[in-house]
């Protein structure tokens, strides 16, 4: 069974020539929305995502505007409002060393450099300069860990284990 990943959400149409307005969920919109690439539309009703080929991409304000082959006017794309744009796992590109997809990080166990278990990563936030990992602790409130070299010492995706240095005031 194919594992699918969201890269955007179709929130509206734009104009009358079949453009759709997308709120992007990818860090690589220029690469992901390149003309000729295939994305998959998954509608709100469920079912298997179906392929669409990108014929144009441009940015407008905070949105990405896309058109698809075979969908040349607003009436043809109106049905896609609220749908998700997805890619199969085999279309995920290789990342540089020290970079990870969210789905690789979420679910990893977090330990201190002394070996004390802190919890499991349940969410990744992107508030600004660096990502923040939300750690679900066995007891008490969630813990927020900044993804910076001074704190995150080692990430082992294969073993789903992250080792951190606890800076003063972090816990």
From Swiss-Prot:
Keywords: Chaperone, Cytoplasm, Ribosome biogenesis, rRNA processing. One of its GO terms (biological process) is rRNA processing. It holds the Pfam family PRC. It is found in: Cytoplasm. The keyword Transport does not apply. GO terms for molecular function: ribosome binding. Residues 97-170 form the PRC barrel domain. GO terms for cellular component: cytoplasm; ribosome. The PRC barrel domain binds ribosomal protein uS19. Binds ribosomal protein uS19. Belongs to the RimM family. PANTHER family: RIBOSOME MATURATION FACTOR RIMM. An accessory protein needed during the final step in the assembly of 30S ribosomal subunit, possibly for assembly of the head region. Essential for efficient processing of 16S rRNA. May be needed both before and after RbfA during the maturation of 16S rRNA. It has affinity for free ribosomal 30S subunits but not for 70S ribosomes. HAMAP family: Ribosome_mat_RimM. This is Ribosome maturation factor RimM. The gene is rimM.
């Amino acid at each position: 069974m194919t594992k699918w990943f969201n890269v955007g959400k179709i929130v509206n149409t734009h104009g009358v020539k079949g453009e759709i307005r997308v709120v992007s969920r990818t860090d690589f919109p220029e690469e992901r929305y390149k003309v000729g690439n295939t994305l998959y539309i998954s509608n709100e009703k469920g079912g298997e995502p179906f392929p669409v080929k990108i014929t144009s991409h441009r940015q407008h304000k905070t949105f990405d505007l896309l058109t698809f082959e075979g969908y040349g006017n607003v009436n043809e794309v109106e049905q896609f409002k609220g749908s998700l744009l997805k890619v199969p796992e085999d279309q995920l590109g290789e990342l540089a060393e020290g970079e990870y997809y969210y789905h690789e990080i979420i679910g990893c166990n977090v330990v201190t450099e002394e070996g004390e278990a802190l919890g499991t990563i349940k969410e990744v936030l992107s508030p600004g300069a660096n990502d923040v990992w939300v750690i679900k602790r066995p007891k008490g409130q969630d813990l927020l860990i900044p993804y910076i070299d001074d704190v995150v010492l080692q990430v082992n995706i294969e073993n789903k284990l992250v080792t951190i240095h606890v800076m003063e005031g972090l816990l």
